[in-house]
């Protein structure tokens, strides 16, 4: 809970938040969980990219525009992230949390690239200046554990989300 509060304190200094499906999931979840309002402009790339002809989830769109997450993160998605988190909670295996942080960092880095792509598509339509893409950084820390990820993909049952009954 401490880190989540730090996150809310951190984002309140920004006037715009860029997300993928955040207007439907992340922001409402945070507002309900913390009984607060996140009062800043939001750019939800899910809908912006849909208007430009890109559909599907974040990983599909990344693939469609040629963004690679690397071999170690092949097939890793939101469900895998939940498995990694549950595995970490159960085992305290640092490689699980490193893999999860690596996954989330890639989400964040690729959102910047997709925002630039969307902006440039609109800039071309309106014949205005486009943005230069920054070179995508290489993440040196938080290395993913490919063996653990493969294990969780093959044996998800123990670490799958529990249904609320």
Predicted features, each with a name:
Residues 1-165:
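DEDD superfamily 3′-5′ metal-dependent exonuclease/proofreading module
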